[in-house]
Amino acid sequence: QDEKRPRTAFTGDQLARLKREFSENKYLTEQRRTCLAKELNLNESQIKIWFQNKRAKMKKASGVKNQLALQLMAQGLYNHSSSSSSSSSSSSSIFLLA
């Protein structure tokens, strides 16, 4: 059974460096990721995931919706909004688009 790796607690210095790098480039080359990992004493996957998460967070904060998502929402087939509505009995449905 595979155990999940514990959550990485980045230091303030590591976060500051990652944020500075992100402000210059939203995407890293493999070479840049390798250098950053060595510089910050992290492994490359930690750097990669941090950048992926940061891009996703920015995309979500921008409020820009994907065109396909808008079409599916109009058809009532898609709603991934994080509203605070509580439904005690939620049912799952699978839709196949032909």
Curated annotation (Swiss-Prot):
SS bond partners: none
GO molecular function, one term: RNA polymerase II cis-regulatory region sequence-specific DNA binding
DNA-binding stretch(es), residue numbering of this chain: 3-62
Cross-referenced InterPro entries: Engrailed_Homeobox_TFs, HD, HD_engrailed, HD_metazoa, Homeobox-engrailed_C-terminal, Homeobox-engrailed_CS, Homeobox_CS, Homeodomain-like_sf
Location within or outside the cell: Nucleus
Role noted for this protein: This protein specifies the body segmentation pattern.
Family indicated by similarity: Belongs to the engrailed homeobox family.
A GO CC term attached to the entry: nucleus
Keyword Transcription regulation in record: no
Protein species of origin: Helobdella triserialis
Gene Ontology biological process: neuron differentiation; segment polarity determination
PANTHER family: HOMEOBOX PROTEIN ENGRAILED, HOMEOBOX PROTEIN INVECTED
Residue ranges with Low complexity bias: 81-98
Alphabetized UniProt keyword annotations: Developmental protein, DNA-binding, Homeobox, Nucleus, Segmentation polarity protein
Mitochondrion as UniProt keyword: no
Top-level lineage group: Eukaryota
Post-translational modification summary for this protein: Phosphorylated in the Ser-rich domain.
Protein name (Swiss-Prot/TrEMBL): Homeobox protein Ht-En
Stretch list, region Disordered: 79-98
